[in-house]
């Protein structure tokens, strides 16, 4: 099957949506399909469209549906589709979709009942590296990794600020990986690192 994965164009090379689309493409190819990732629908011939982010890929979804009304379309609702609220545009995309993917069970609670029969939960997976235990000795810290670009909609410093309230004997350290997409976070990250010994921004 020829599968087209449509992901939003992003200001950063490796957005969460792009990473998800690339990973799904690999998994689909491993299952014997021909899968490709694009940021625009430009008339590509495909048997199935998977559109990541119902709002940002709606134009491509509508164009594919118009060109191939008999071919299935799946909409994957990603983070900012759902939070803080589902937009009218995303709801229109759900109307067009034959199936809807969400990435965690709690997301189902945010989707109107009329679309419930379309929804499937696909829990994200990752290839784990070989264990590094013992290579550098035992750590004195319990490390929490936050992965996400810094922009307001994601509340990216929430974990760091929560870590400030931990008891002094706690061994928790917060390491944050993600690009700065809103410039004010450059100053806020520096300030957080200066006052919070538990927090480190990795870039």
Predicted regions and their residues:
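Conserved donor-binding loops in enzymes that form glycosidic bonds
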Residues: 8-10, 79, 124, 146-152, ...
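Short N-terminal targeting/anchoring amphipathic segment
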Residues: 39-59
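Active-site proximal beta-strand in glycosyltransferases
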Residues: 48-50, 64-82, 99-102, 119-120
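A conserved, positively charged/aromatic
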Residues: 84-98
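Acidic anion/phosphate-binding donor-loop and adjacent secondary structure
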Residues: 85-86, 126-141, 183
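A short, active-site helix/loop in glycosyltransferases that binds the activated sugar's phosphate group
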Residues: 96-131
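Conserved donor-binding/catalytic core segment of Leloir-type glycosyltransferases
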Residues: 136-154, 159-166, 174-177
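Nucleotide-activated donor-binding/catalytic signature segment of Leloir-type glycosyltransferases, i.e.
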Residues: 176-178, 186-203
